[in-house]
Amino acid sequence: MDGLSDRESGWDGAQLQHVQPSYRQVLRLRLLVLWLPLVIAALVADNAALGDTPFYGLASIAVPLIAILVVAIAPQRIYRRLRYGLTERLLQVVRGWLFHTDTIVPFVRAQHLDVTRGPLDKMFGTATLVVHTAGTRNSIVTVPGLAPDRAAEIRDIIREHIRTDFE
């Protein structure tokens, strides 16, 4: 267990919350697509190159086993550690299974906002909020796995805040 509750207080009072539960399926399918060529390559290499060696069969067992473990375990762990929070002046994104990242984006730094949906997002009812900031390092901040309506709502909140800051 990671010790985090369903809602956790973030920076400046932001209530950190999980993204859509269906995002786990998006992650699972993306990992499956990533690992499938590696499994095929391992099977081919094992039969072609290792056929006459004592290591024959090792790649045919090890790589698919690792792929199954990654596809089964990683999506849940990534999901549990992906949170976002919103206050009246900032967006906070907390993520990281192996490497923890806590990103805080003040609305006044936002320059461009997008809501994107790929085929898997459409299939599972998720969207990604993309915030382009004025910074040079980490100038693009993403919040994947949001419900499409929630992503549009956050985009509109940030856009309205940007508009009022310049008036």
Model feature map: region roles:
Residues 1-108, 112-167:
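N-terminal basic, Ser/Thr-rich segments that initiate or prime the first beta/alpha elements at protein or domain
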